Amino acid sequence: MNSFDEPTLGFYSAQAKSYVSHRPDEIDPQIAQFLDLLKPGARILELGCGGGVDAAHMISRGFDVDPTDGVAEMAAIAEQRLNRNVRVMRFDELATVEAYDAVVANASLLHAPTKGLPAIFTSIWAALRHGGWHFATFKTGAASGYDRHGRYYNYLSRAEAKALYRDAGDWASIDFDEWPGVGYFSEPAMWLKMIARKALA
């Protein structure tokens, strides 16, 4: 296990339809607030778009969205919702340079193996244009490992996430927030939100 976890991808492949059916159609309010930071028509890369709920709302607000997911079955569901191509791409396959005004990763990077995060975060930084924004949410409060559904979580602490992002590139700002919430199957979870802005030059 280095840059991706096969059992976790397998879970989402097998459970794609069931997982999407549990997801409300409303956009995550944390993302809605983040989008207010962006200029109209901003080019957004979404990593781990799932069934495409957040992408649909971003598109409805006039943003130029590039939705991606590492699981083909998820991408297919998102394509039906969005009526557009959804690329099948794992986090470690991101190789674009200075192409996006924002990179959104809502409850997706939390499945990336900790050892693979430095390279992934560096790729995200590289994909952003100068002054671009990055939004990500993670689960926190436990040691990295698998949940009862067989999904891997890196469970980063605020300090760990901040150190990893700082090492990934030159950021103008990196801000965090934590709150109690729920995850899949309405299981209690502590969430960590990260918003960073790439340096202007």
What are these regions (language model features)?
Residues 131-138:
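Conserved beta-strand signature within the Rossmann-like core of class I S-adenosyl-L-methionine
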